[in-house]
Amino acid sequence: MTKDLRPIIWDDDKKELILIDQRKLPNKLEYFICKTYEDVAYAIKDMVVRGAPAIGVSAAYGLALAEINGDDIYKAYEVLKNTRPTAVNLFWALDRCLTAYKEGKSILDEAKKIHEEDIETCKKIGMIGEKLIEDGDTILTHCNAGALATSAYGTALSVIRFAFYNGKKIRVIADETRPRLQGAKLTAFELNYEGIPVKVITDNTAGFLMQKGEIDKIIVGADRILADGTVYNKIGTYSLAVLAKYHRIPFYVAAPLSTFDLRSSEEDVIIEERDEKEVAYIDGVRIVPEGVGCYNYAFDKTPPDLITAIITEKGIVKPNRDEILKLFR
């Protein structure tokens, strides 16, 4: 596992969920203790924990806490489900736990299974995807699709990690990823923590580096992937994909099967809009004039024709319906 960086810990003795408080990184490594499902809901909504797989695992433990504390399971399910609207892993994990509950099984046992499976899944994604990385590559990534966004290893960063573990000399460029700066604060923290060479750039530097020929590949994660290969991911992903297409740079998406949504159409997907204060303020200091509003979309949509391939725990596929559906047979 990625040294001792464990973003999600279940304490069986105290019946508590322990999360790395990602709001405090990179300056402080602190933990947020969840004793109730309400604590978990707050942690997801306020981005104590973030990243589609990590949200799913945390929500599963949240429903387990509701069962342990004798709370109304269906109420807890609704509260947790409504924390964030775009990442499909949240709904997948909650539905799986609710099904277990209806079948008379332990929600906690199901949550533990989801947690363990996520670790193994992310490991497989890395082992499969690293074959796409060549010695000497410079890889651009966006937001944080690492261990902090999952239970371990990550998705996009798992590919990078395993290339590094296998002795490939690589370099990583991390977009800062405004407004929450997950690239600068989290991706750079993770990679530096493991000794993987990384540099941070402002979001608007990416195109210039591509123009200069300094980017060999782009790897990002995903919050939801539709059956036709449409990818919903952190805002700014679409812009990178357009630039990559123009500059003929391979653009890969790394995600587990739990991130695929085979039922929904584009019209069904809600793009989360967060508080405009996240854009208007940096570290508590207002940078936008009073009286001026801000857009703060958390995610965007990347069409499949801009994506080279999708890396999953079952293999690498082209972003089209036929190949994606084969993954689920």
From Swiss-Prot:
Belongs to the eIF-2B alpha/beta/delta subunits family. MtnA subfamily. Its EC number is 5.3.1.23. The record marks C143 as: Transition state stabilizer. This is Putative methylthioribose-1-phosphate isomerase. Catalyzes the interconversion of methylthioribose-1-phosphate (MTR-1-P) into methylthioribulose-1-phosphate (MTRu-1-P). Transmembrane segments: none annotated. Keywords: Amino-acid biosynthesis, Isomerase, Methionine biosynthesis. It catalyses: 5-(methylsulfanyl)-alpha-D-ribose 1-phosphate = 5-(methylsulfanyl)-D-ribulose 1-phosphate. One of its GO terms (biological process) is L-methionine salvage from methylthioadenosine. It comes from the Archaea. NCBIfam families: eIF-2B_rel (TIGR00524), PRK05720.1 (NF004326), salvage_mtnA (TIGR00512). Substrate binds at R50, G51, A52, R84, Q182, N233, K234. It comes from Methanocaldococcus jannaschii (strain ATCC 43067 / DSM 2661 / JAL-1 / JCM 10045 / NBRC 100440) (Methanococcus jannaschii). The active site is at D223 (proton donor).
